[in-house]
From Swiss-Prot:
<dbReference type="GO" id="GO:0005829">
    <property type="term" value="C:cytosol"/>
</dbReference>
<feature type="binding site">
    <location>
        <position position="414"/>
    </location>
    <ligand>
        <name>ADP</name>
    </ligand>
</feature>
<feature type="binding site">
    <location>
        <position position="12"/>
    </location>
    <ligand>
        <name>sn-glycerol 3-phosphate</name>
    </ligand>
</feature>
<comment type="subunit">
    <text>Homotetramer and homodimer (in equilibrium).</text>
</comment>
<dbReference type="GO" id="GO:0004370">
    <property type="term" value="F:glycerol kinase activity"/>
</dbReference>
<keyword id="KW-0319">Glycerol metabolism</keyword>
<feature type="binding site">
    <location>
        <position position="266"/>
    </location>
    <ligand>
        <name>ATP</name>
    </ligand>
</feature>
<dbReference type="GO" id="GO:0006072">
    <property type="term" value="P:glycerol-3-phosphate metabolic process"/>
</dbReference>
<keyword id="KW-0547">Nucleotide-binding</keyword>
<keyword id="KW-0418">Kinase</keyword>
<feature type="binding site">
    <location>
        <position position="245"/>
    </location>
    <ligand>
        <name>glycerol</name>
    </ligand>
</feature>
<feature type="binding site">
    <location>
        <position position="14"/>
    </location>
    <ligand>
        <name>ATP</name>
    </ligand>
</feature>
<feature type="binding site">
    <location>
        <position position="410"/>
    </location>
    <ligand>
        <name>ATP</name>
    </ligand>
</feature>
<comment type="pathway">
    <text>Polyol metabolism; glycerol degradation via glycerol kinase pathway; sn-glycerol 3-phosphate from glycerol: step 1/1.</text>
</comment>
<dbReference type="Pfam" id="PF02782">
    <property type="entry name" value="FGGY_C"/>
</dbReference>
<keyword id="KW-0808">Transferase</keyword>
<dbReference type="InterPro" id="IPR018483">
    <property type="entry name" value="Carb_kinase_FGGY_CS"/>
</dbReference>
Length: 498
């Protein structure tokens, strides 16, 4: 009887369930979208119960549609949109407010106040993060401050906090397990990544009672089992948890110090495994936990690119220059260069290493001879220049020269982007056969905990290369192009509308 690992990939706009076999191959997929709520400008919320319903639906669908019995599921792995925050009543199981999503800016004033009080470096030193609304801690404080009676309930021990992984494990286990893993805890602004414990000083600054917080566990461990009615009477081990970007790092088998993966999604995320050392960044990177396994944690450096694949969506939906994302490749390859055109897609500011929230998108180098093909090519090239910006910051902070770049996300299907990426970073780019690396990482973590796979070496054998892109551009051309990009970014930062 063939066994499978069921991976739950709970994302920002949809929930997915994916079955993986022992070779790490996909045996079935189900997906369901859920509603986004925007109560005010800059606020983004989800209904945690709707997320739970969507997860139940896709788990049921993937099992039924692929004729898999519940007793064929060896374990469940969970990967989740990071930082999104749920607070719920531990007696009724009902959330007391919507889940506040990672993108939501409704806690900006809390962050500004803490910065004015001089606490930014305290948070940076202990958590490796920036004092920003992106992270979970200020979201918890906002809920306790703004929902009537919440603070009193929290102090009486009646409320629980969790990121989405915690919420799903609690529900799946029938309220038995209130846990998170090291990778998700490291995104809360409340967890000391050096001591590996919730930090009393930070909790006091955020006025969050410690009794609300989940127990922090390794990323690969049996946390509990499903209760009867979810799996037709089967008690299936819930055995692996990691935040989405860390799960992708694990799914790419980036197990060694210096291994790097880059995800080209709506935005871009690059993570470097820095081994057992938390590398302090001087270049605007985040220091975070990659995963905890085998009794120790691996740390990572993380760089964020705000606009990656969404630049291609902009070409399609905003400018109507292309009818589909794949069409961008054929247009880009009709010309040999951009003829000096640069697109800086700072639609919502610039991420690592600039962290300039006021910058806005800009185009440079236009001439009467500029055609649609040049413009499209320049937009695709911008993804690669931004990736080099982050990679250079990583090499500077870590002292490690990146030997190869493993890639995933929607834009990796574009061969032009992959080749230009290799050229502009002067490093081989490796595209895997299975590009569902986030879900695969969660499956690997769960599979290790239940003996489905024996070791990380066993897992590494399952990682298969689809295509390798080696750099072909000569150094003079590469550096000339990159100098042009840096000038374009500099000019973008100078021009600010009032």
């Amino acid at each position: 009887m063939e066994k499978y690992i069921l991976s739950i990939d709970q994302g920002t706009t949809s929930s997915r369930a994916i079955l993986f076999n022992q070779k790490g191959e996909i045996a079935g997929v189900a997906q369901r979208e859920f509603k986004q709520y925007f109560p005010q400008s800059g606020w983004v919320e989800h209904d945690a119960n709707e997320i739970w319903t969507s997860v139940l639906a896709v788990m049921t669908e993937v099992i039924n549609e692929n004729d898999v019995r519940a007793d064929q599921i060896a374990g469940i792995g969970i990967t989740n949109q990071r930082e999104t925050t749920v607070v719920w009543d531990k007696h009724t199981g009902r959330p007391i407010y919507h889940a506040i999503v990672w993108q939501s800016r409704q806690t900006q004033s809390i962050c500004s106040e803490l910065k004015q009080q001089g606490y930014e470096q305290t948070f940076r030193d202990k958590t490796g993060l920036l004092l920003d609304p992106y992270f979970a801690g200020t979201k918890v404080k906002w809920i306790l401050d703004n929902v009537e009676g919440a603070r009193e309930k929290a102090e009486n021990g009646d409320l629980l906090f969790g990121t989405i992984d915690t919420w799903l494990v609690w529900k799946l286990s029938g309220k038995a397990a209130h846990i998170t893993d090291y990778s998700n805890a490291s995104r809360t602004l409340m967890f000391n990544i050096h001591d590996l414990e919730w930090d009393d000083e930070l909790l006091e600054l955020l006025t969050v009672p410690k009794n609300m917080l989940p127990e922090v566990k390794p990323s690969s461990e049996v946390y509990g089992k499903t209760i009867d009615y979810h799996f037709y009477g089967q008690e299936v081990p819930i055995a692996g948890v990691a935040g989405d970007q860390q799960a992708a790092l694990f799914g790419q088998a980036c197990f060694e110090r210096g291994d790097v993966k880059n995800t080209y999604g709506t935005g871009g995320f690059m993570l470097m495994n820095t081994g057992d050392k938390a590398v302090k960044s001087e270049s605007g990177l985040l220091t975070t936990i990659a995963y905890g396994i085998d009794g120790k944690v691996n740390y990572a450096l993380e760089g964020s690119i705000f606009v990656s694949g969404s630049a291609i969506q902009w070409l399609r939906d905003g400018l109507r220059m292309i009818n589909s994302a794949p069409q961008s490749e054929s247009y880009a390859t009709r010309v040999d260069s951009t003829e000096g055109v640069y697109v800086v897609p700072a639609f919502v500011g610039l991420g690592t290493p600039y962290w300039d929230s006021e910058a806005r998108g800009a185009i440079f180098g236009l001439s009467r001879g500029t055609e649609k093909e040049h413009f499209i090519r320049a937009t695709l090239e911008s993804l690669c220049y931004q990736t080099r910006d982050v990679m250079e910051a990583m090499s500077k902070d870590s002292g490690i020269d990146v030997q190869s770049l493993r890639v995933d996300g929607g834009a990796v299907k574009n061969n032009f982007i992959m080749q230009f990426q290799a050229d502009i970073v002067n490093t081989s780019v490796e595209r895997p056969e299975i590009q569902e690396t986030t879900a695969l990482g969660a499956a690997f973590l769960a599979g290790l905990a239940v003996g489905f796979w024996e070791s990380k070496d066993d897992i590494a054998k399952n990682w298969k290369l689809e295509e390798k892109f080696d750099p072909k551009m000569d150094e003079g051309e590469r550096e000339k192009l990159y100098r042009g990009w840096k000038k374009a970014v500099e000019a973008t930062q100078v021009f600010k509308t009032e």
